[in-house]
Amino acid sequence: ACLLSRGLGDVYKRQTLRGDVENIHIGEGSNIQDGSVLHTDPGYPLKVGKNVTVGHMVMLHGCTIGDNSLIGIGAVILNNAKIGKNCLIGAKALITENKEIPDNSLVIGSPGKVVREITEEEKKAIIENTKHYQDNWKRYSKSVF
């Protein structure tokens, strides 16, 4: 089952949410962009926190994403990985199974490595990015529905 919280920012076109064996929960204000795949395995539900941006062509598989994080274009996050709050996961990063990323981390590479703590400016930029997509969804939903 896919559980979308009230106040969802947006789920764009052409992505796949497969909650066929475990639940997928997408938190309030989060956005899932074009071409992303969200899937689970037995024993590995998927949870996306509040106000998360999941970039284009991302693969989330049985993992947990903390509030106010940004997952860059083409990143892959595998079973039982846990991304903390306020994290920035770089484009094309690979987060392997069971990896735990602390709050406020910048992660790049394949496999992904924490390179430093994000700055206050980067935290603000993540929030602004998420707000941009929330505003887009509000505009879009008024014109379509």
PLM region spans:
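Glycine-rich hexapeptide-repeat left-handed beta-helix
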Residues: D20, E28, D34-S36, T40, ...
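Active-site cofactor/substrate anionic-group-binding motifs, chiefly glycine-
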Residues: I24
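Single conserved hydrophobic/aromatic residue that forms the stacking wall/gate
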Residues: A1-Y12
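Well-ordered beta-strand segments characteristic of repetitive beta-sheet solenoids
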Residues: D10, E28-G29
